[in-house]
Each structure stands twice: as structure tokens, then as C-alpha cells.
């Protein structure tokens, strides 16, 4: 994503992430439309989309191979700017970013796993309605990711990160005490706000560790998201 970004790393990162977020959002909708009426065997049709994605990924890999040398030079230029900071400061900053992503992943995993059960238990809605509500929340997450990436490039990533952290807190505290329409509306706002900083955090991390995209991806997509999922199981 960053190879194709030009000077808009935040937007490129957000577009990359919205693929996963968009898939997560469509999942509950497809479950309500296909799996509930037709059974689990309907999932087999999704293999066609996976085959198409594999073919697309092969083409992207060919392009990636040709661009790798140019991107390495760009990473070296970024590395010269980061060199003014000590290794200790860089590692502390990276650890803070990991904690931020972990907290967001923890909340997202909790909402994805339990939001439908919360709606069914508190408001007595059907499984189909609860899945559609989860779809609305996850769609807001996908939209917030793209908007946050664009705003981070335009106004600065630091402001987006702080706004995402502090902006979601009051809505999160209000969520258990609202009626059904306001609960859904508030969940959508939370999804928009809490996801807006994902791309900004990841771009910051790749700038702190230029040329170490694999390590950064492992820390933020693997470790943080994995720990967030494990943490949500205890609540």
C-alpha cells in the first residue's frame, strides 16, 4: 500500500485496511441474507471471491517485485530523518502505539463478538436484526478508517490519534444506558471515531521503523489484534 501511496501514506494505509474492515462488515449481512435462510453450505459460494482475490494478489505481487528497489531508497531517506532519535525513544514510541492498537482491537473484538447478543438480550430483537445492526457498526468502522487516513494526511496524524482516543470515550460510556435507536446510532458514531486512527498509528509505526514493514505488520496486525481477541474473551 505504501509503495503506491506517493505522499499520501495515511490514505493508502486506510484503503488497504478498509478491505479487511469491509469484509468484516459484509460478513454479518451475508450471514443474515444467505446463511440463516440457506444453511452453512451457502458459505461455499464465497470461495469464488477468494479465487478472484488470489488472481488479483498474483498481479499485485508482480508489480511489487518491480517497485521494491525504488521503495528501498525511499525507506533509506526516511531512516535518515528517524536517526536523530535514540533507539530507546523509538522503542518507547513504538510500544505506546502497540498499546493503543491493542486497546482498539480489544474494543473492536468485544463489539464484534458480543454486540449482537447484547441487542438480543436487552431489546429482544431477532438474530437477523442484530446481524444487520452489527453490519451498520462495522460499515461505520470501514468508513471511519478511510476518512481518518485522509484527514491524517491533511491535518496531521497526531490530531487524528488523540481525537480517536478521546472522542470515542463518552459515547462508549453512554452506550449501555440508551434505548434501541440511540444505541444503534451511538454504536455507529463509536465505529467512525474509534477506527479513524488505525491508519495514522500504522503509518507512524512504519516511519519509526523504515524498511521493517514485515515486523510492523506482525506487531500491529498479528500481536495486537490477537491479544485484543484473547482479551475480549475474558469479558
Predicted regions and their residues:
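Structural signature of the two symmetry-related core transmembrane helices
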Residues: 159-173
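Flexible cytoplasmic inter-helical loops of multi-pass small-molecule transporters
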Residues: 46, 59-83
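Cytoplasmic helix-loop-helix junction between adjacent transmembrane helices
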Residues: 1-19
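Helix-to-loop junctions at the C-terminal end of transmembrane segments
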Residues: 145-156
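Extracytoplasmic gate region of multi-pass secondary transporters
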Residues: 91-135
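Helix-loop-helix hairpin linking two adjacent transmembrane segments in secondary transporters
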Residues: 16-63
Amino acid at each position: 500500500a505504501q509503495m503506491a501511496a506517493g505522499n499520501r501514506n495515511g490514505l493508502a494505509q486506510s484503503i488497504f485496511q478498509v478491505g479487511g474492515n469491509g469484509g468484516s462488515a459484509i460478513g454479518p449481512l451475508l450471514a443474515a441474507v444467505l446463511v440463516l435462510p440457506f444453511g452453512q453450505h451457502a458459505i461455499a459460494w464465497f470461495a469464488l471471491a477468494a479465487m478472484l482475490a488470489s488472481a488479483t494478489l498474483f498481479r499485485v505481487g508482480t508489480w511489487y517485485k518491480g517497485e521494491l528497489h525504488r521503495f528501498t531508497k525511499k525507506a533509506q531517506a526516511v531512516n535518515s530523518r528517524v536517526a536523530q532519535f535514540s533507539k530507546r525513544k523509538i522503542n518507547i514510541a513504538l510500544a505506546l502505539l502497540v498499546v493503543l492498537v491493542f486497546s482498539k482491537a480489544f474494543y473492536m473484538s468485544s463489539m464484534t463478538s458480543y454486540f449482537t447478543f447484547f441487542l438480543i438480550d436487552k431489546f429482544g430483537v431477532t438474530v437477523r436484526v442484530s446481524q444487520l445492526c452489527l453490519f451498520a457498526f462495522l460499515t461505520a468502522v470501514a468508513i471511519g478508517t478511510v476518512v481518518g487516513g485522509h484527514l491524517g494526511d491533511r491535518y496531521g496524524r497526531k490530531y487524528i490519534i488523540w481525537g480517536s482516543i478521546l472522542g470515542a470515550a463518552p459515547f462508549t460510556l453512554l452506550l449501555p444506558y440508551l434505548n434501541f435507536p440511540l444505541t444503534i446510532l451511538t454504536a455507529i458514531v463509536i465505529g467512525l471515531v474509534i477506527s479513524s486512527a488505525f491508519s495514522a498509528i500504522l503509518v507512524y509505526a512504519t516511519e519509526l521503523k523504515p524498511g521493517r514493514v514485515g515486523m510492523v505488520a506482525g506487531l500491529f496486525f498479528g500481536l495486537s489484534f490477537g491479544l485484543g481477541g484473547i482479551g475480549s474473551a475474558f469479558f
